[in-house]
Amino acid sequence: MPFPRHRRGFTLFELLVVIGLIAALSLVLLGGLGGGGKSAALQSAQAVLANLVSAARTKAQADGGGTRLLINIDPANTADPSRFLRYIAIQTQVAGVWQSATVVDIYLPEGVYVVPGNFASIPAGLFSTGTAAPWTKSDSAPLRSTALRANQIISATINSPATEQWVSVGFAPAGTTAQSGDIILAGGHPRAPGSFAPGESPVELENPETIRGLTLSAYGLPTLINDRASF
């Protein structure tokens, strides 16, 4: 008599994603109970981002193919402006071809955005000018996500009918990356409709003093960074 076949268990990749999202949700709930507000949202976003990086790295190693983390940097999507600097996806590469279906896609918590890299063009109005502190690092360099490189900007249609601009962070089958550097998160808010011109940023980042993020090593390993002075 044949025994019934049981469904397979979670893969390591799936467990990483689930555990990370549960941890991030816990931070939001605890922060909400304690009145943490934006600080809790930043902590949650940091946990989500680190988990996505680890998941992309693990997936590359498990499949023996490349993966990439994609961050939406397109300010012109009027159909869903909430994707700008908040929507992140993981794609896999099979036989040298990037697969259109994403293995993971998620929005960062509301009110938290990825700070762009040193791109040739950054939409006007993104960085608040109403803060006493400038948008610079401790060494006076611009406060930018150095792991997000201008030469890794692509146009792609991902979970939307629109073709948008994305910046990618790639992982090799060994789990390594050629894009070591920082990925910075900052609090912000959508700008009021009609208050900005086409092509300008639909969101405004609020305060360079309250940021979090991570530093990505060449081995693809994230290290959490909790304040501006540490970037």
Regions found by a protein language model. Give the residues of each.
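Residues within membrane-spanning alpha-helices of integral membrane proteins
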Residues: 20-21
